[in-house]
Regions:
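Histidine- and aromatic-rich ligand-binding microenvironments
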Residues: 2-6, 36-37, 94-95, 117, ...
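Helix-adjacent hinge/juxtasegments
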Residues: 55-75
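Short, well-structured N-terminal submotif of metal-dependent ribonuclease cores
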Residues: 1-36, 49-62, 127-128
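Alpha-helix/helix-capping structural signal
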Residues: 8-9, 39, 77, 119
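Amphipathic alpha-helical segments within well-ordered protein domains
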Residues: 8, 42-45, 83
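Acidic, PIN/NYN-like endoribonuclease modules and their adjacent C-terminal/linker elements
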Residues: 108-136
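Short active-site oxyanion
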Residues: 1, 31-34, 68-70, 107-112
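Active-site neighborhoods of divalent-metal-dependent phosphate/nucleic-acid chemistry enzymes
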Residues: 71-116
C-alpha cells in the first residue's frame, strides 16, 4: 500500500531517541512506498539539523536512495490547491507543508497519511475521500 509522509513521521523514524520512534518504525516497515513531498524534505532537514545534528540529515539523505521513500516535486496544480487549502483553513493555522501533503495526497488519490500531527490532518476534509487515514 502507498502512503504519503509528513515531517514528524520522518523525524521520529530517523531519530532513535524520539518517543514515537518504535511505533513509527513499525508503520514504516508495513509500507510499500512512501511519497515524500519536497516541501517535507526541507522541513525534515531543518528539524533534524536543529534537534539531532547534521549527521542525522546526512543519514536521512542517504536513506532516501535505498528506502521506501520516494521524493516527489510539487506541481503547479499542487501549488494552486495549496493556496485554496491555506485560504479555506486559515483560521486553523494549517501551514504550507501540511497543505502540500494534503494537496499531493488528493492529486495522487492517496488516503493514508503518515503523521504525528493529528490536529491539522483531522480537521481537513479532502476531496478524494471522506477523511484521511492517519498513521500511527
Amino acid at each position: 500500500m502507498n502512503s504519503l509522509a509528513d515531517t514528524g513521521f520522518i523525524v521520529a523514524l530517523i531519530d532513535s531517541q524520539d518517543s514515537h520512534h518504535r511505533e513509527v518504525k513499525n508503520i514504516y516497515l508495513q509500507q510499500q512506498k512512501i511519497i515524500v513531498p519536497q516541501s517535507v524534505l526541507a522541513e525534515v532537514a531543518y528539524l533534524l539539523g536543529c534537534n539531532a545534528g547534521i549527521s542525522s540529515v546526512i543519514q536521512f539523505l542517504r536513506l532516501l536512495k535505498t528506502s521506501r521513500f520516494e521524493l516527489m516535486a510539487l506541481t503547479e496544480e499542487d501549488l494552486s490547491r495549496i493556496g485554496d487549502i491555506l485560504e479555506e483553513y486559515q483560521d486553523s493555522r494549517v501551514d504550507f507543508v501540511d497543505a502540500s501533503v494534503m494537496a499531493m495526497a488528493e492529486r495522487l488519490n492517496l488516503t493514508i497519511i503518515l503523521t504525528l500531527d493529528r490536529r491539522d490532518f483531522s480537521l481537513y476534509r479532502p476531496q478524494n475521500c471522506t477523511a484521511f487515514t492517519l498513521l500511527p
